[in-house]
């Protein structure tokens, strides 16, 4: 399951935050096939003045609105799956009024042994060991 950190500006109403998180989750289900009940989400709010970006980097004309920053920690995925996730997120979030030019996504791959979902246990390694019998 990926760990997704959603960084947004202060002041978004709770219903909008909830809708945003559900839309992002639906994108992961669609692009990566994660379970409907999967995924872990952390939502951080920051002050607009705390984000400083190059508004024209890579020839992308960003608006004066603060970007939506997504940080994804996940087991390794293929280049094709990453590209598909980027495309689906941009497409679906644009429907909510988030300009694709203002969407910043970073994926940090991890290995199975890098995860514990509680109890101080590496569940993914146990799952791997159990499937080898």
Residue ranges and their predicted role:
Residues 1-133:
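Interaction-mediating elements
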